[in-house]
Amino acid sequence: MYLEDFINYIKSEKRFSNHTITSYETDLNQFFNFIQLEYQITKPQDVSFKLIRNWISSLLENNLKSTSVNRKISSLKSYYKFLIVSNYVDTNPTLKLISPKSSKRLPVFVEKDNMDSLFDKDFFEDSYEGKRDKLIIELFYFTGMRLSELINIKTSNIDKVNSQIKVIGKRNKERLIPITFNTLKDLNEFINFYEIENFLFAEGNGKKLYSKKVYRIVNKYLAKISSIKKKSPHDLRH
């Protein structure tokens, strides 16, 4: 994997601190373990963009903080940049990689254990509304996306191959948000079963959900796990 060469490079030429070097080495070893165990890949030139996206999704699925995920992505980008310059590989699979947005942590009154229990227990009905509500809570909690981004998601914005969603952020800027395997599975089941074709979350007339309705949905479920009176989608962005 040329890891030793890379470590020597950042140590002697880049003169990174011992702490930074250790972090890089740890991140890369974790990635190598993932691709070897999951895909039996032992050569960096065999790594694809999709494979890296799967790795990132697995990190997010294990509730790793977005700041930690971003650091690991940075380590991988530096590693592949070195491989390209050193002519060890011909292509760089990290070029189109976008780091997940770093968002605020959950407020103390929305404990992680409580959120986990919300998904584990039968709080959501086995109906269109129940499945829709669960997806809304999932997307807010696991991606940190904004309310305006969520209500504007269309089925065409969901990249099932790379496990990511394209959203329109502030000032009409597009960004790609990685999603976990479980969330992608729930999305696929919801879209296919209810034959969703345009807006992911829509009213009966096909128009996107109103912001106030999303607020009511979030408040309904947070009331089951929190005693705080004022609750909103922002409380789920961690």
Where do the language-model regions lie?
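Conserved catalytic core of the tyrosine transesterase superfamily
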Residues: 1-238
